[in-house]
């Protein structure tokens, strides 16, 4: 499954009443595709999936597939902590025409490694789509062990993982012990270059909303052997990568887009907009790019 080097974990635009704004989404998609994005993740965590209804998610899948019109792969966030519900949503995503699904590790109910294995296996067996796993223990509490990820990689259509554990030893083990066509993506913008250095494919990114073209240049320099230049770009981008997570995601990146002249609306409760100090800090970092 080739979804490129930079897959943007796309925000969901809202109007002034908090409804999904599809006109703003159309504008956002075109903007992202012109600024370094190789593929789009729809209705993931950055897309505020916890506060989107099932109907809204399906509408987002359908609209994005139609709007993208084959220009880049579309990845649907269909994971949850309910296996049956994930299967249902995955089937709806497949009907909508997406190219891949992303499945987050089950949150809150804290399954065992065997439970997570069976969960992902059950969903993968119900779809013909490629599956990208998503390990983000900082949000889910339960962490997918590298041994479990390696075992899951044996399932034919489980073909990638977004790794946001921050554990480079575990990530290296996954890369070393899975097939060459099983791709490991960084789930943390700031670890993109280190994960490339141990054999990773790229990043599922939030920062690419703002600095996608710069990130593409960093990856290009690295893959062309210009590692010192790649390191300099990494150092330049690290402040904005960190700033975008100083408040709960995606409030900072939505504000950053607004500061760049792209109105995408606010966030849904229980998330709240940035306060004035946070906004000023973000604006200062952006002005130095």
UniProtKB/Swiss-Prot annotation:
Its main location: cytoplasm. The active site is at residues 134, 162. Pyruvate binds at residues 46, 204. It is found in: Cytoplasm. One of its GO terms (molecular function) is 4-hydroxy-tetrahydrodipicolinate synthase activity. It catalyses: L-aspartate 4-semialdehyde + pyruvate = (2S,4S)-4-hydroxy-2,3,4,5-tetrahydrodipicolinate + H2O + H(+). The record marks 45, 108 as: Part of a proton relay during catalysis. SMART domains: DHDPS. Signal peptide: none annotated. Its EC number is 4.3.3.7. One of its GO terms (biological process) is lysine biosynthetic process via diaminopimelate. InterPro entries: Aldolase_TIM, DapA, DapA-like, Schiff_base-form_aldolases_AS, Schiff_base-form_aldolases_CS. Pathway: Amino-acid biosynthesis; L-lysine biosynthesis via DAP pathway; (S)-tetrahydrodipicolinate from L-aspartate: step 3/4. Belongs to the DapA family. This is 4-hydroxy-tetrahydrodipicolinate synthase.
């Amino acid at each position: 499954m080739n979804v490129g080097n930079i897959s943007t974990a796309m925000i969901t635009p809202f109007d002034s009443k908090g409804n999904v704004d599809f006109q703003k989404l159309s504008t956002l998609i075109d903007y992202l595709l012109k600024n370094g994005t190789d593929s789009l993740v729809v209705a993931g965590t950055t897309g505020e999936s916890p506060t989107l209804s099932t109907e809204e998610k399906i509408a987002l899948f359908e609209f994005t597939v139609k709007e993208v019109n084959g220009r880049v792969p579309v990845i649907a966030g269909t994971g949850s902590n309910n296996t049956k519900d994930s299967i249902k949503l995955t089937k709806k995503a497949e009907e909508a025409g997406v190219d891949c699904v992303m499945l987050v590790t089950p949150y809150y109910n804290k399954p065992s490694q065997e439970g997570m294995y069976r969960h992902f296996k059950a969903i993968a067996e119900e779809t013909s789509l490629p599956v990208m796993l998503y390990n983000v223990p900082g949000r889910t509490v339960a962490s997918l062990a590298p041994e479990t990820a390696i075992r899951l990689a044996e399932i034919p259509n489980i073909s990638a993982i977004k790794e946001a554990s921050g554990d480079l030893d575990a990530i290296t083990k996954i890369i070393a012990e899975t097939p060459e066509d099983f791709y490991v993506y960084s789930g943390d913008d700031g670890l993109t270059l280190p994960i490339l250095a141990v054999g990773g494919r790229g990043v599922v990114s939030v920062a690419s909303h703002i600095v996608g073209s710069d990130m593409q240049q960093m990856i290009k320099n690295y893959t062309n052997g210009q590692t010192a230049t790649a390191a300099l770009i990494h150092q330049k981008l690290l402040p904005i990568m960190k700033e975008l997570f100083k408040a709960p995601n995606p409030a900072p990146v939505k504000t950053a887009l607004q500061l760049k002249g792209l109105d995408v609306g606010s966030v849904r409760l229980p998330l709240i907009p940035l306060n004035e100090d946070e906004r000023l800090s973000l604006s200062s970092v952006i002005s130095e790019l």
